């Protein structure tokens, strides 16, 4: 992961003079209504001077109408105005002031259509700042409204009980015909609000965020638009800004739905592709523009607006999902190719990745891809680990449906998809989650729990039900909406320990006085249990770097409930051993054998991940000592040792062909190296390792079971040799594999090892073969085991071991 302290946001402390967002150009090139001959309106470019503009007024004046740019112009009939019922439409002055200032909790109670008490009339009130006139249209009848407040509140009474109507709003440049946003009931039901309050809404994304929809009026007319809903419980007011109101939210205050903390509004005429934000009057009295926490799409960074999006994708991966639901991955081959989409090959879109990445992964025999975080993030240098939009795949490579296409293509090719997920912390960008409603909302209010000092980020308040719900639902969202097969949860250790990376006195203990984060434990258990309940065959994977017990133990037995855990200890010990000169390795032999002491305490994945090839650590190849021949040979032996060792496999992109340079997220992998036979040989080896791994059950069937592994000789430190057997549950004669790795810089002739039974054993892998760029030192394809006990086994064979090489033997 990468968690540099990045803050790209700018606090919005007041209204802009032009009513425009600070990070986007003036959108006022949209069509504008102006008078034309015959008493009708026509469309003209908003950049042209309006015939009705006041002297000195320009198209950039804030008096430009707050109306959708797509609003159709109205006809101007010659009929005289209808006579409105003689009833009062006034409001208390305080209500009007709160309404126009954006601080009213329920603008729908004042605006829209309301039956007049004591008569059969309906009062219609409209908020349209900068409008010159407002007329309510009921069929052919026209009812001019009276200005109730200089801030743009108009009102009129019309005959009948809640008739269908539309509104004609006249601005300096002409009239617009609009539908009333304030005549509709909330789009969230009582059960939705109850579940949100309880923190148990498992499909939160279906009720919050922006949703194109069609609503029906009491008279049966259909009104299309977008419903918006956001959680901001301490806000004094929330307004909607976007392309549909020229980024001037005065005309679109939202209503609060009581103690749920949800603010909601349906905007007629808005549609897919519209950019928007919430303008929030915080508890501290400061206005801020905030991106939608549940945005499904965003602008391409560094722009920060949310984008209305509705999927119309058709999935074709039903066969894969059916197979996944029947698969127990603990006893299946899992070989993961970890990839950063932006730098695998620079410049590719999701659709291009679907073609090129899928073909590459299939060709090289991997079973899964794991993508570094794809949720939207403002700073590319964070590699995706500082997320600003948890529900939106990054727009850098295309739309959400194009990301769906990538997943669908991988599935149809038989490749599973794992995505990195970051529920531990989030960035401080002022337009994103931080201090969302003017208070610590998503983050813990106490900085000793709410801030991560190493990364300069905020930490989620996992004790708050709504925050837990936001994250649990987010995990479910990626499985349900994008058909992913697994989440790798980043930085779990930072979540589990209250004193993680904190000085003495810089952290708060739990209620028992300990350092365990009980809220995080409960959250992880809930997330894992819910995912496995709803998505059979899913994977939940922990990046957990400590010895926390029971990470992959089921939740009903007190564990965290993950399916797999990265074996960080194995990775560190193995790389440390292999970074030493062979002559010194005998003194560190235990580093390679220690992993088997705890190998069955969890369900492990062996990772050579992105974290090991950045920040000056060098590439995997450059970690190996010696000259170039020795580095390549050592890397080949190490990879074979990894594939033979108990545990699922994960290899970061570029390592499969021995990239020279350490990874750089702003550059493509060093693909020209594949023209070098030495690097092509490493690629061939990885391809063959994956092929053998998928076809030899002994290599994967009992990864988490002691019955699947036994040492031949764990103690040959003098020769730097490790030999062991892998077993499957099949007939012993065909269900065993002998793996011997020589990490010495010299070969060994006449090296005797014990084997479980006599007979011919085929050499099915030799990393020193010519095919892989080696010297072809080996055993001519097979060895003969004789009935001479050795190493506590009934038979033995004499081998030739290549320098810095590994061989695998299988009964013939």
UniProtKB/Swiss-Prot annotation:
Write the protein's name: 1,4-alpha-glucan branching enzyme GlgB
User: What are the recorded GO MF terms, alphabetically?
Assistant: 1,4-alpha-glucan branching enzyme activity; cation binding; hydrolase activity, hydrolyzing O-glycosyl compounds
> Quick one: where's region Disordered?
1-83
Question: What's the superkingdom here?
Answer: Bacteria
Task: Give the catalysed reaction(s), semicolon-separated.
Answer: Transfers a segment of a (1->4)-alpha-D-glucan chain to a primary hydroxy group in a similar glucan chain
Extent of Polar residues compositional bias? 1-11
Q: What class of enzyme is it?
A: transferase
Q: What is its EC number?
A: 2.4.1.18
Tell me the route in metabolism or biology where this protein functions.
Answer: Glycan biosynthesis; glycogen biosynthesis
- Which SUPFAM superfamilies does the entry mention? (Trans)glycosidases, E set domains, Glycosyl hydrolase domain
The subunit field of the Swiss-Prot or TrEMBL record says: Monomer.
Does Glycosyltransferase appear among the keywords? yes
Known InterPro entries for this protein? Answer: A-amylase/branching_C (IPR006048), Branching_enzy (IPR037439), GlgB (IPR006407), GlgB_N (IPR054169), GlgB_N_E_set_prok (IPR044143), Glyco_hydro_13_cat_dom (IPR006047), Glyco_hydro_13_N (IPR004193), Glyco_hydro_b (IPR013780)
Pfam families referenced in this protein's UniProt entry, alphabetically = Alpha-amylase, Alpha-amylase_C, CBM_48, GlgB_N
The residue ranges flagged as biased composition, category Low complexity, are: 49-64
- According to its UniProt record, which residues of this chain constitute the active site? 490, 543
What is the protein's known function? Answer: Catalyzes the formation of the alpha-1,6-glucosidic linkages in glycogen by scission of a 1,4-alpha-linked oligosaccharide from growing alpha-1,4-glucan chains and the subsequent attachment of the oligosaccharide to the alpha-1,6 position.
Kindly list the cysteine pairs connected by disulfide bridges.
Answer: none
Recorded GO cellular component terms are:
cytosol
């Amino acid at each position: 992961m990468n968690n540099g302290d990045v803050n790209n946001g700018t606090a919005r402390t007041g209204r802009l003079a032009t009513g425009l967002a600070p990070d986007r150009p003036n959108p006022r090139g949209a069509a504008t209504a102006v008078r034309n001959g015959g008493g009708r309106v026509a469309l003209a470019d908003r950049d042209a001077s309006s015939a009705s503009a006041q002297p000195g007024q320009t198209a950039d004046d804030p008096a430009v109408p707050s109306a959708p740019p797509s609003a159709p112009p109205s006809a101007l009939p010659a009929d005289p105005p209808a006579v409105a019922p003689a009833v009062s439409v006034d409001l208390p002055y305080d209500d009007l002031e709160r309404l126009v200032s954006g601080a009213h909790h329920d603008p729908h109670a004042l605006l829209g259509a309301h039956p007049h008490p004591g008569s059969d009339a309906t009062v219609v009130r409209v908020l349209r700042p900068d409008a010159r006139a407002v007329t309510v249209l009921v069929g052919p009848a026209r009812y001019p409204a009276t200005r109730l407040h200089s801030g743009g509140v108009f009102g009129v009474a019309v005959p009948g009980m809640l008739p269908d109507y539309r509104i004609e709003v006249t601005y300096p440049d002409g009239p617009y015909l609009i539908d009333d946003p304030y005549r509709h009931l909330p789009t969230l039901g009582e059960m939705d609000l109850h579940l949100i309050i309880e923190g148990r809404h498992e499909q939160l994304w279906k009720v919050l965020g922006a949703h194109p929809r069609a609503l029906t009026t009491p008279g049966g007319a259909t009104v299309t638009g977008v419903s918006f809903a956001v959680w901001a419980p301490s806000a004094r007011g929330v307004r909607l800004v976007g392309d549909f109101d020229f980024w001037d939210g005065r005309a679109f205050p939202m209503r609060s739905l009581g103690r749920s903390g949800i603010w909601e509004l349906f905007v007629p005429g808005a549609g897919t592709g519209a950019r928007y934000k919430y303008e929030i009057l915080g508890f501290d009295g400061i206005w801020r523009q905030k991106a939608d926490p549940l945005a499904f799409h965003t602008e391409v960074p560094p722009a920060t607006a949310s984008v209305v999006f509705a999927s119309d994708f058709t999935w074709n991966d039903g066969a894969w999902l059916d197979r996944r639901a029947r698969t127990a991955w603990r006893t299946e081959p899992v070989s993961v190719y970890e990839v950063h989409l932006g730098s695998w090959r620079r410049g590719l879109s999701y659709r291009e990745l679907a073609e090129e990445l899928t073909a590459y992964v299939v060709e090289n025999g991997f079973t899964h891809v794991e993508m570094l975080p794809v949720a939207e993030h403002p700073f590319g240098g964070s590699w995706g680990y500082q997320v600003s939009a948890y529900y939106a795949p990054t727009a850098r490579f295309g739309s959400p449906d194009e990301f769906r296409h990538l997943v669908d293509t991988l599935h149809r090719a038989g490749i599973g998809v794992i995505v990195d997920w970051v529920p531990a912390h989030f960035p401080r960008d002022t337009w994103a989650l931080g201090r969302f409603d003017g208070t610590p909302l998503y983050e813990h209010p106490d900085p000793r729990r709410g801030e991560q000092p190493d990364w300069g980020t905020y930490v989620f308040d996992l004790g708050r039900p709504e925050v837990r719900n936001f994250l649990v639902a987010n995990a479910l969202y990626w499985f349900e909406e994008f058909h992913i097969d697994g989440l790798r949860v980043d930085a779990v250790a930072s979540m589990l320990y209250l004193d993680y990376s904190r000085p003495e006195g810089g952290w708060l203990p739990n209620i028992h006085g300990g350092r365990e984060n009980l809220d995080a434990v409960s959250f992880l258990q809930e997330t894992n249990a819910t995912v496995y309940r709803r998505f059979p065959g899913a994977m939940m994977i922990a990046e957990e770097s400590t010895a926390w017990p029971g990470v992959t133990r089921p939740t009903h037995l007190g564990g965290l409930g993950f399916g797999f855990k990265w074996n960080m200890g194995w990775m560190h010990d193995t790389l440390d051993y292999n970074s030493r000169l062979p002559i010194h390795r005998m003194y560190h032999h235990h580093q390679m054998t220690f992993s088997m002491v705890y190998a069955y305490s969890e369900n492990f994945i062996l990772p050579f991940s992105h974290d090991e090839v950045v920040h000056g650590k060098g590439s995997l190849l450059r970690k190996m000592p010696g000259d170039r021949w020795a580095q390549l040979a050592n890397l080949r032996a190490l990879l074979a040792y990894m594939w033979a060792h108990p545990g699922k496999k994960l290899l970061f992109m570029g390592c499969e062909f021995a990239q020279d340079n350490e990874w750089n997220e702003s550059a493509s992998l060093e693909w020209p190296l594949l023209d070098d036979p030495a690097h092509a040989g490493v690629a061939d080896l990885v391809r063959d390792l994956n092929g053998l791994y998928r076809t030899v059950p002994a290599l994967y069937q009992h990864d988490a079971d002691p019955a699947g592994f036994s040492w031949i000789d764990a103690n040959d430190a003098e020769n730097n040799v490790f030999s062991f057997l892998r077993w499957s549950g099949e007939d012993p004669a065909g269900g065993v594999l002998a793996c011997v790795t020589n990490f010495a810089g010299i070969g060994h002739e006449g090296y005797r090892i014990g084997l479980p039974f006599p007979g011919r054993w085929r050499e099915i892998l030799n990393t020193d073969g010519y095919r892989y760029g080696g010297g072809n030192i080996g055993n001519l394809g097979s060895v003969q085991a004789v009935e001479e006990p050795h190493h506590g086994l009934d038979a033995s064979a004499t081998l030739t071991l290549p320098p810095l090489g590994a061989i695998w033997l299988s009964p013939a």
